[in-house]
Amino acid sequence: MAESNKMKEMPVNKLMIRMGIPMILSMALQAVYNIVDSAFVGNMRVGSEEALNALTLVFPVQMLMVAVGIGTGVGTNALLARTLGQGNGKKAAKVAGNSLFLGVIIYVVCLLFGIFGVKAYISSQTVDAEVLEMGVGYLRICCVISFGIIFFSLFEKLLQATGRSFYSTIGQVVGAVVNIILDPIMIYGIGPCPEMGVKGAAYATVIGQVASAVLLFIFHMKMNKEFEHGAKYMKPDGGIIKEIYAIGLPAIIAQALMSIMVYVMNLILKFNPSAQTAYGLFYKVQQFVLFLAFGLRDAITPIIAFAYGMRSKKRIQDGIKNGLIYTIILMILGIAITEIFPEAFATLFHTGASREYFIGAMRIISISFLFAGINVAYQGIYQALDGGVESLVISLLRQLVIILPLAGIFSVFVRNGQIGISLIWWAFPITEIVSCFVGYVFLKKIRKNRVNVLN
């Protein structure tokens, strides 16, 4: 069955499973790097608590680099696919070339930040000299050798634009495997490799990213024959760059909001480094669970968008219903695992002094997974039905407008000794529940104005 026929004729529930599983696995792999690093670092013989705190502080910048790379790739993907659909091979070559030019610019910015800005960034979140040293060492390596993650993100989208997403998945798997193998060797010093501690974790991460990028570069050059390759196509074209970011900028903003939220939460929790570490570790577990919802969202959006294009009210309604049902199932599974096994996760990270805070955060914040997953599904539905503004509003509510003021206010009571740190964790479920209510109102409005009017 041709791809367009599948989108048109295959039962929506079956189509969503078929499209969603690879995307869910792909998103889950993206979360593996950070969890693996933290697990091995948490089991260091000396300084593990400080090292985990350092990884918590550097995480927002890591997410921001990924956000810019993926956002640029998203814009490239959509523009390249459209251009190829129009049969314009010359412009397609320029689109691909300009995306690589943008990758070079992004890398130079990351490199300069790695050399000149890392220390000021880390010191804004901690006064602990050991944490500062570890954080600077780790983040400097990640920024200076960031070309791996940047170009992996671009080549991944170039392959997806030509229908070769299988090869990008291979690249992700290879990078994750390389990272997992190198982490204990470089962190603990196994064989001829010296013990490098937290810097070893950074080197293992970037080597895995470079391995993925190199492999995808080879796939791109050998498989993407629909357009020409060459340095001449990297000459910047203002019109093409504008088109790329007209599509990709919203994706960058949405991802960047996550970085801002984590950074500000680190500042709010600065008065208690153990709670700060616990939040950073839990966020990586939370990210892994929510990435399941993100992967399913990436299936929900094209299915509903295709149905909207063919003006099929039934397939749109089936897409909304099945998307929400499958998301709820995944999130209930995530809640069950995190509520039942918080001690197992604490042991995995060898949390030490932050163990109590970590378990408390997991038991409270994981309640929000159900509502957070529904919000993510809502955003996929909005985007499919031309509801970009509604999607952005939900992102702002979840990651900026509600959560940060609420956590800040709660932290005042905690610092004054009036109540325990758990009050701050309750800001997350409250935020997701309120956002979910607003999201439901948006969904009713969109269904009334854009779906129910269809024949």
Predicted regions: what they are:
Residues 52-112, 149-168, 278-342, 372-386, ...:
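Small-residue-rich hydrophobic transmembrane alpha-helices
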Residues 23, 27, 39, 78, ...:
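Transmembrane alpha-helix boundary and packing residues in multipass membrane permease domains
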Residues 73, 142-160, 168-176, 201-216, ...:
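Short runs within selected transmembrane alpha-helices of multi-pass transporters and secretion channels
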Residues 49-60, 135, 139, 202, ...:
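Small-residue hotspots at the loop-to-helix junctions and early N-terminal turns
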Residues 1-20, 80-147, 193-248, 304-368, ...:
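Short alpha-helical transmembrane segments in multi-pass integral membrane proteins
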Residues 28, 32-53, 122-129, 185-196, ...:
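Helix-terminus/linker motif at the lipid-water interface of multi-pass membrane proteins
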Residues 7-47, 60-75, 79, 104-111, ...:
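N-terminal transmembrane alpha-helices
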